[in-house]
Structure formats: C-alpha cells, structure tokens
Amino acid sequence: GLPTQTVQYTGTDVDDLNQFLQNNTGKIVQLTQDIQVYKNTNGSFGIIMVPSDTILDGNGHRLVMKAGYTEAPDVGVVLYVYKDGVIPSTNCGVKNLSTDIPYVNSINVFSADNILIENNTLNNATKSGIMISDEYGSTVNGIIRGNTINNVGDDAIAVYGNHSNLLIDSNRISGAKGFAGIAISCLQNGQQIRVDNETTGPHDIIVTGNVVSGCSGEALYCIGSYKTYITYNTLRDSILEGVCLDSGCIGNYFAHNEVVNNGIAGGLPG
C-alpha cells in the first residue's frame, strides 16, 4: 500500500530533491520550503521524479522557477524515475503541492498501480494539469482528489487510454481550453482513432463531486468509455456542452449532477 512514514526534505534544489526521493523510497517525503526548478540542456533535469512506494508531500509549498532561468521543464512531477525504467510505478503519489509554472503537463502519469494525486493547485500548464497517458501501458487503482486546476491550454484532467478503477473526486477546474475540463478518452496518445474499432478504453471510473466551470470545450467529455459513473458534479459556464458522451460510450451512469449555463454545441472544440 501507500507509505505512511514521513521524512522531511529541507533543501530547495530540484535535482537534490530527486536524489533525496530515491534515497528515501518507501516514505512520504515532506517539503519544508519551495523547490526551485529549471530546465537543463538534457531536458530531464528539473522534472521531479517520484519513485514507487513514495509520496511527495508539498506541505503547502510551491514549485518556482530558479533565479536566472526562464524556460520551464516539460513536466512538473512524474510518477516514474527515468533511469530505472520500471513501468508500471506502484504505490506512489503527490499531494499538497502548488505551481504556476507553465509546464506542458504539471503532473504526468505514464503507467501506474495504486496512486494518489491529492490537494494540489496546478495553474497555467500549456496542456494538462494532470495527464494520465498510455504510452507505456494502463494505470489502475488511482485517486485524483481535491485538486484545483486553472487556466490550462488543453484538458485540465486528462485520462487517455485503457485506464480503470480511478476515483476523480472533488476537484475544482476552471478555464480549460481543450476538449474539456475533465476528459476520459480512448484516444491513443491523444490521437484520433476509429472508436468503433476499439475493444479497450477507460472503464470503471467514478467522477463525483467536481466543480468544472468556464471551459472552452465541454465541462466533461467522454469518448469510448464504459462503466463511468458521473454523480454530484457541478458543470457550468462552458462554451460547448456541459457533458458529452461521445462515440463508443457504453454503460455509463449520469445522475444528480448540476448542469448550468453551458452551450448547446457538442463534439470536439475547434
């Protein structure tokens, strides 16, 4: 299961934090001050890599750009250690962390089992605040809860691929400019495919208690998903529909949601 023992990291440097995380696998690593990040020439430096059996607890602190650097790393936090090459990651997560840095994705999950992404504030990503992608396989058994995501260039929470047993709960999203505030999609690596040829897709996902507002696409968009349970969400003020269950959606459940002042056009924006 997830780790329970806490150890504090007292530094500020992102590369030093990565080494500390690897030295303290099996623990909750709690920050005591903001972390300074930057993009090195090889591209991987500046990305926080959380190993398996480890949680990064921001403890209310932030990721900020290091003085003298202007280019952000591609990603803020990944639940993966590049040099280990172990997929899927297991029993890991990130919580209580904030950033306004314009990453491509603020938090990226490639393939993982039993993850926690909780109480983070993620603003200004050029793509997604939280991206669960399928380049290396599926993610199962995850909690995405209590995050605040604003002003992203694509989907605020993106679940792309054959992922399952996820709880997307009590997140607050505004100003997403992509498909939707929350997108649950069988599109492989974000690419358009023929949904009627697909035999896999995101499934057994609960979307509950979220507030999604002011999006350029739909508030909630599903394509090729099955057994998605959508309850007690507030979906409002989006340019397109409040909710779109698009091609290939089977056996989804939608009840007790408040859908207010959205557009009537549907499908993909643009």
Model regions and ranges:
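Intrinsically disordered, low-complexity Ser/Thr- and acidic-rich flexible linkers and loops
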Residues: 85-86, 135-137, 186-201, 265-268
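Solenoid scaffold repeats with emphasis on beta-solenoid/beta-helix
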Residues: 29, 35, 48, 54-56, ...
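Short glycine/acidic-rich loop motifs that flank beta-strands on beta-rich extracellular proteins
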Residues: 39-45, 65-71, 102-109, 126-132, ...
